[in-house]
């Protein structure tokens, strides 16, 4: 949605701001203040704030400012090129920019792993999920593999004989947006504090009390668009419902990607893929949006989602 010919300048601006922010957070003065604060008598709320401040300080002070600046610039450039390449499924165009970003990220991971005394992979995980480790993740996936592997075969076998009516090219992009906005409102999204726009991929971002959701529309598979909207609505509602009394404080920010994704997947997977929701959706499509064909019946759209 931003002008593409200004991309290079925006990348430079973001890189500079990232460098300034990094220098402020990683300064010796901040480290001294954190040490002094540890001697204070703090309530639980401010103990949590101090914990998060120290974590951010350790991560930031471990990295040189020029590397932080380079990563920010490379990330902004790569995202801009990817947005154009995504329209044409042109991976070759984005590849060199992605390679540069990967090289810089590996440098970051090596520095952080040495500081945190863990593997490079675990160091990067901790940027997005505090206190996560490879052992914990490995255990979770091993348990999932034991449960899911035989179940997937059973599901595929069951679906072989099911008759499903296609809905391809039966819902325009504008209709998808109208349905998506309607569902967002029903789920409880506050349009006085956020909005929905179009992009090359579903995203959720913004600032306190100002959340922006984007999605892309697919006339071949309209439910992929609707699920994308519902997924990002989950992210948005989590952000909009963080405790207002802790706004702008470290402990009042989202905890990590595991919690964030749990909220988006709760909406997308547990709610919108359930048969109860499909019954609700079928009624909405037929009564409110006049989609009267049999393909919009509850059983058919439920089966479509299970494929």
Give the role of each language-model region.
Residues 250-261:
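Active-site metal-coordination segments of metallo-dependent hydrolases
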Residues 71-223:
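Contiguous, non-catalytic segments that form substrate-binding/exosite surfaces or channel walls
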Residues 1, 54, 158-160, 209, ...:
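Short acidic (Asp/Glu) and glycine-rich catalytic loops that position anionic groups and cofactors
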Residues 5, 199-202, 254, 281-291:
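A glycine-rich phosphate-binding loop feature that marks nucleotide/adenosyl-phosphate handling sites
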Residues 1-130:
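A well-structured
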Residues 113, 224-244, 261-268:
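Active-site recognition of the HExxH zinc-binding catalytic motif
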Residues 271-307:
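Long, amphipathic alpha-helical stalk/connector segments used for oligomerization, subunit docking
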Residues 186-192, 222, 236-247, 271-278:
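Secondary-structure transition/capping motifs at alpha-helix termini
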């Amino acid at each position: 949605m931003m002008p593409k010919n200004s991309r290079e300048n925006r990348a430079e601006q973001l890189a500079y701001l990232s460098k300034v922010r990094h220098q402020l957070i990683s300064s010796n003065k901040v480290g001294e203040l954190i040490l002094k604060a540890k001697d204070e008598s703090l309530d639980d709320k401010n103990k949590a704030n101090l914990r998060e401040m120290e974590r951010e300080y350790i991560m930031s002070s471990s990295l040189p400012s020029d590397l932080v600046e380079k990563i920010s610039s490379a990330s902004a450039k790569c995202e801009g090129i990817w947005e154009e390449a995504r329209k044409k499924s042109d991976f070759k165009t984005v590849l060199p920019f992605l390679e540069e970003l990967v090289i810089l990220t590996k440098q970051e991971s090596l520095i952080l792993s040495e500081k945190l005394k863990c593997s490079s992979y675990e160091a990067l995980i901790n940027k997005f999920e505090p206190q996560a480790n490879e052992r914990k993740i490995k255990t979770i996936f091993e348990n999932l593999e034991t449960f899911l592997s035989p179940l997937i075969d059973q599901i595929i076998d069951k679906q072989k004989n099911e008759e499903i009516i296609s809905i391809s090219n039966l819902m325009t992009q504008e209709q998808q947006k109208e349905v998506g906005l309607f569902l967002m409102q029903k789920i409880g999204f506050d349009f006085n504090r956020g909005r929905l726009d179009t992009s090359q991929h579903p995203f959720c971002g913004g600032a306190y009390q100002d959340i922006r959701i984007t999605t892309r529309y697919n006339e071949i598979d309209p439910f992929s668009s609707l699920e994308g909207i519902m997924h990002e609505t989950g992210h948005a509602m989590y952000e909009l419902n963080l405790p207002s009394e802790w706004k702008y404080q470290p402990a009042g920010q989202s905890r990590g990607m595991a919690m964030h994704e749990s909220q988006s997947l709760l909406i997308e997977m547990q709610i919108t893929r359930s048969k109860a929701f499909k019954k609700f959706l079928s009624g909405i499509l037929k009564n409110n949006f006049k989609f009267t064909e049999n393909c919009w019946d509850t059983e058919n759209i439920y089966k479509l989602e299970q494929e």
